[in-house]
Amino acid sequence: MNQAAAPKVSFVSLGCPKALVDSERIITRLRAEGYELARKHDGADLVIVNTCGFLDSAKKESLGAIGEAMAANGKVIVTGCMGAEPEQIEAAYPNLLSITGPQQYESVLDAVHRALPPLHNPHLDLVPAQGIKLTPRHYAYLKISEGCNNRCSFCIIPKLRGDLVSRPAGEVLREAEKLVKAGVKELLVVSQDTSAYGVDLKYAESPWQDRNVRARFYDLAKELGELGAWVRLQYVYPYPHVDEVIGLMAQGKVLPYLDIPFQHASPEVLKQMKRPAAQDKTLARIKQWREICPELTLRSTFIVGFPGETDSDFAYLLDWLEQAEIDRVGAFKYEAVRGATSNALPDQVSDEVKTERWNALMARQQKISARRLKRKVGTRQQVIIDEVGPTVSKGRSKADAPQIDGSVYLTSRRPLRVGEIVTAKIERADAYDLHGSVAGF
């Protein structure tokens, strides 16, 4: 007797690493129920599109992905941030099977079950203990909370994902332990506001191994650092207690890397942005951090052309960049997002000026990046291998997060493996990347 074919689902995941984790959770549940993943839409029984709705450009990309799925398959379920305000999606594609907002895993699964029932009851042994991951096997995103309590004027994330909801520390650590046991070498800690972790739980303790651990940024980072993997902290707001984790970096417990979205430097612009810690003595803190941990790498993002940003404000930002010597920078031209309070601010900046300022900032940052990378020539760096080539392999140092930072290009006299961590001698640097060879051979 022929066995019925397992139902197949194609999946599109758009947006940030937090959304990628949402996709991984949905896929893990589907695989546990016997669904198979199809590589192409036309080879699937239905398609799920996890959308991004933060910027208009992201919404355009999401609508395009939905359109491609409809054209290739016709049976489409939409979820994610753009689904929180479904009117635009419904107007463009009225025949979708379902539209849900972010984190609504059960609603997505219910929609799948209605359109494409599973063949049999769930068998949890169909999936590995660490769940299904969409990243390469050697690194994984570890989401520690949902939502955000901040009300930055340019952002609608709290409207889409709600207020901060932290996971108990023990739960996070158990997931991290499973990932490391499955071969993950690098844990990328993500959330909307990583350093606010545990505020909503009042830093409550939860059991982990033979002890209790508080749901607190420092405590969690310290415990993660004991698992034997690289631990990279991302989306960290510069609250005062962030100073505490610098010591962990100096001790080698977590990677000497902080991803802090400063967004601007001008006090007036920060005030209009309603950014936390807007009046902080940030330059003095950065100097102190580097005194404690000289190997510290700082990554940040900035918005140029925010309403009311003057030539003086922008000059202040460029000067601040020179003094701060931020290692890695991403910059965005301000874009009005429907529902953001910054849309109502006076003195909107023209697109032409935004482009001029973006080009000027990136040119300045390129010089800063090249200067800082040049200091690493002649040093030895640990590098995790992402891609193996016939003559040159590509990896990342402790200073490089996947997808967003630079790379280290290496030659080696012996074969390398993806996920392997090697010691490399740095021989050359350019504006964003390092070049060298595997040491000791």
UniProtKB/Swiss-Prot annotation:
GO molecular function annotations of the record: 4 iron, 4 sulfur cluster binding; aspartic acid methylthiotransferase activity; metal ion binding; protein methylthiotransferase activity
EC nos: 2.8.4.4
InterPro entries associated with the record: Elp3/MiaA/NifB-like_rSAM, Methylthiotransferase, Methylthiotransferase_CS, Methylthiotransferase_N, Methylthiotransferase_N_sf, NA-bd_OB-fold, Ribosomal_uS12_MeSTrfase_RimO, rSAM
HAMAP family from the UniProt entry: MTTase_RimO (MF_01865)
Name listed for the protein in its UniProt record: Ribosomal protein uS12 methylthiotransferase RimO
Residue ranges constituting the TRAM domain according to the UniProt record: 374-440
Residue positions binding [4Fe-4S] cluster 1: C16, C52, C81
Listed Gene3D superfamilies: Methylthiotransferase, N-terminal domain, Nucleic acid-binding proteins, tm_1862 like domain
Binding site for [4Fe-4S] cluster 2: C148, C152, C155
Stretches of the chain forming a coiled coil according to its record: none
UniProt keyword annotation of Iron present: yes
CDD domains noted in UniProt: Radical_SAM
Cofactor note as given: Binds 2 [4Fe-4S] clusters. One cluster is coordinated with 3 cysteines and an exchangeable S-adenosyl-L-methionine.
Organism, as annotated: Rhodopseudomonas palustris (strain BisB18)
The family this protein is said to belong to: Belongs to the methylthiotransferase family. RimO subfamily.
Domain called Radical SAM core: residue spans: 134-371
